[in-house]
Swiss-Prot record:
Protein encoded by which gene: hslO
Gene Ontology molecular function, alphabetical: protein folding chaperone; unfolded protein binding
Subcellular location: Cytoplasm
Family under the similarity heading: Belongs to the HSP33 family.
Protein name, UniProt field: 33 kDa chaperonin
Species per Swiss-Prot/TrEMBL record: Rippkaea orientalis (strain PCC 8801 / RF-1) (Cyanothece sp. (strain PCC 8801))
InterPro entries assigned: Heat_shock_Hsp33, Heat_shock_Hsp33_C, Heat_shock_Hsp33_N
Length: 301
């Protein structure tokens, strides 16, 4: 099944639902960064959460950044997700592995840490980005993003995130975001019903691995509440905006002396993108051209 995002409403528009399948893009992140099992689960959950949050933005080009910094051995992670369905991300310590937690699951909370912060930045492409910071609740990502939605956006929300990774890589990943909109937030019975149904689920990946599609999941949760599934299906992908041109631009900012030193000592330069682990090689000729450009610009000014 292709990585995708679909939306739905229920309760006469009082409930907003978004579903994401992110199996392939999570596997690509795992392969690119050579992630451990627990690091794969952590980054996969965070990338899915980023896509779910970005789906609520309106302006073309809008993006959401999620940064989690905890006191666990994983260190932290950063995700950049767009309204256009693209996402990228990395973890600080990709090779960290931990024993399963008490429930026999990957210990994402132990890897990230239970103490720390979640930083969310929403960039709509103009003006100053909107940023918010909340303390971590569990380090499991889903709890922490739900806490952010409740405190910073004041929207009652239920969030399910899941990644199943084994010896063959990632075989299931995705998530569901259910939100009670302001016009229905005072309906305590509706909120209680939604919370009860979500709490009875065993998680997202068991649903996906059992063969259920996103519409199936929506039907299970909201089918008797006037469910309306929107027809649009958005395809999702891991995509990084890095390029050799950007690398050369960054090297140019180092200045003539540093570039000359690289030519003499290293016969060039190597740069690795943190977001996608793509490696770029700049030859001594490339660096010499940058020096020429700097000198030309200096004379022109």
């Amino acid at each position: 099944m292709a990585d995708q995002l679909i939306k739905a409403t229920a309760a006469d528009g009082g409930i907003r639902a978004v579903g994401v399948i992110s199996t392939r893009l999570t596997e690509e992140a795992r392969a690119r960064h050579k992630l451990s099992y627990v690091a794969t689960a952590a980054l996969g959950r965070a990338m899915t959460a980023g896509l779910l949050l970005a789906s609520n933005m309106k302006r073309e080009g809008s993006r959401v950044n999620l940064r989690i910094k905890g006191n666990g051995p994983l260190g932290g992670l950063l995700v950049d997700a767009g309204l256009d369905g693209t996402v990228r991300g990395y973890v600080d310590c990709p090779f960290v592995e931990l024993p399963p937690n008490a429930r026999g699951k990957l210990d994402v909370g132990g890897a990230i840490g239970r103490e720390g912060y979640l930083y969310v930045v929403r960039d709509v492409g103009y003006g100053y980005p909107y940023s918010s910071t909340v303390e971590l609740i569990s380090g499991e990502v889903g709890d922490d993003v739900t806490h952010y939605l409740a405190t910073s956006e004041q929207t009652p929300s239920a969030l399910l995130l899941g990644v199943f990774v084994g010896a063959q890589g990632v075989t299931a990943a995705g998530g569901l975001l259910l939100q009670v909109m302001p016009k229905a937030a005072r309906d305590e019975a509706l909120v209680a019903t939604l919370e009860s149904r979500v709490s009875q689920l065993s998680g997202f990946t068991p649903l996906l691995r059992s063969g259920k599609t996103l519409p199936d999941m929506f039907e299970q949760l909201l089918g008797d509440l006037g469910l309306v599934i929107l027809p649009e299906i958005q395809l999702l992908r891991f995509d990084c905006r890095c390029s050799f041109t950007r690398v050369l631009g960054a090297l140019k900012m180092l200045g003539e002396a540093e570039l000359q030193d690289m030519i003499e000592k290293d016969n060039g330069a190597e740069a690795t993108c943190e977001f996608c682990s793509e490696v770029y090689q700049a030859s001594s000729d490339h660096l010499a051209q940058l020096i020429d450009d700097l000198r030309t610009e200096s004379v022109g000014s």
